[in-house]
Amino acid sequence: NLVKFEHHGFPLDLAALNAELIVRCHNDSNKNFQLLGEIYKKQNNWAVGSDINIINESIKNIGFDSGLSKKNMENCLKDEELQEQILNERIEAQKRYKIDSTPTIYINEKKYDEKNEYEKFKKAIEKLL
């Protein structure tokens, strides 16, 4: 309980928006993070091509494997209020945190720029514990 991870969706296209919608279908934050991990891990499999229907099916398969029902995911994908919320959060984050690329990592409200070097990231976290 020493580190708090927060995920803030920052979709750059429709596929990423739909992936974020599926992630938010889970009400359980632990399952939410597990699903998020699977979506990132399998991103090279689903975030390809130009047919959004095929992309959505790939994302839904990942969601289904994490315990979400197809009906629940379909409802989430159609939830216009949730879509608007996610897009507004993205705009707000872009303004507040000056995000210019993804992923962007903040540690204790300070932007961390060495995100591609795991050992440096690990040391930065351990130094604060």
Tell me what each language-model feature is.
Residues 1-64:
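Structural alpha/beta surface segment adjacent to cysteine/selenocysteine redox centers
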Residues 61-129:
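C-terminal cap of thioredoxin/glutaredoxin-like
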